[in-house]
Amino acid sequence: MGFTDKQEALVNSSWELFKQNPGYSVLFYNIILKKAPATKGMFSFLKDSAGVVDSPKLQAHAEKVFGMVHDSAVQLRVSGEVVLGDATLGAIHIQKGVVDSHFVVVKEALLETIKEASGEKWSEELSTAWEVAYEGLASAIKKAMS
């Protein structure tokens, strides 16, 4: 079964909720660093700070990550596959030392952040929609890394 219109709508509506509050970007990186403190140096906007400090670069990167997952949902519904819009993503992830376990951490942080942003609209169906979209993106990045 492919990605459905309803799943895309769920991702769209919660993506809008995420974008309304810049605090969710800080939450996202706090969750990542709590789960995998060693990843701090992988992010240029975090490596020289004492912790997660809100900044334009942090906001831009979080919006890019969540935006790419959102775009993946659209691609999955339309064509059933995710094609990276940025051909350098594989090389960047290799350069930063990203390994499979990092993709799991980011997925968990993404889902926890969307759960917080969605509030009472959170459901297993919403979680699954984001998870499938993220897995599509992660698979495309991993393919570009090989």
From Swiss-Prot:
Molecular function terms from GO: heme binding; metal ion binding; oxygen binding; oxygen carrier activity
Binding annotation for O2: H61
Subcellular compartments: Cytoplasm, Cytosol; Nucleus
Domain Globin: 2-146
Coiled coil: none
Tissue specificity field: Root nodules.
S-S bridge residues: none
Modification type Nitrated tyrosine: residues: Y24, Y29, Y134
Task of the protein: Leghemoglobin that reversibly binds oxygen O(2) through a pentacoordinated heme iron. In root nodules, facilitates the diffusion of oxygen to the bacteroids while preventing the bacterial nitrogenase from being inactivated by buffering dioxygen, nitric oxide and carbon monoxide, and promoting the formation of reactive oxygen species (ROS, e.g. H(2)O(2)). This role is essential for symbiotic nitrogen fixation (SNF).
Family of the protein in this entry: Belongs to the plant globin family.
Stimuli inducing this protein: Strongly reduced levels in boron-deficient nodules. Inhibited by abscisic acid (ABA) in parallel with lower nitrogen fixation in nodules.
Record bears the keyword rRNA-binding: no
Keywords: Cytoplasm, Heme, Iron, Metal-binding, Nitration, Nitrogen fixation, Nodulation, Nucleus, Oxygen transport, Phosphoprotein, Transport
Protein name: Leghemoglobin Lb120-29
Keyword Transferase: no
Gene Ontology CC annotations of this record: cytosol; nucleus
Free-text description of this protein's post-translational modifications in UniProt: Nitrated in effective nodules and particularly in hypoxic conditions; this mechanism may play a protective role in the symbiosis by buffering toxic peroxynitrite NO(2)(-). Nitration level decrease during nodule senescence. Phosphorylation at Ser-44 disrupts the molecular environment of its porphyrin ring oxygen binding pocket, thus leading to a reduced oxygen consumption and to the delivery of oxygen O(2) to symbiosomes.
Assembly with partners or alone: Monomer.
Annotated InterPro entries: Globin (IPR000971), Globin-like_sf (IPR009050), Globin/Proto (IPR012292), Leghaemoglobin-like (IPR001032), Leghaemoglobin_Fe_BS (IPR019824)
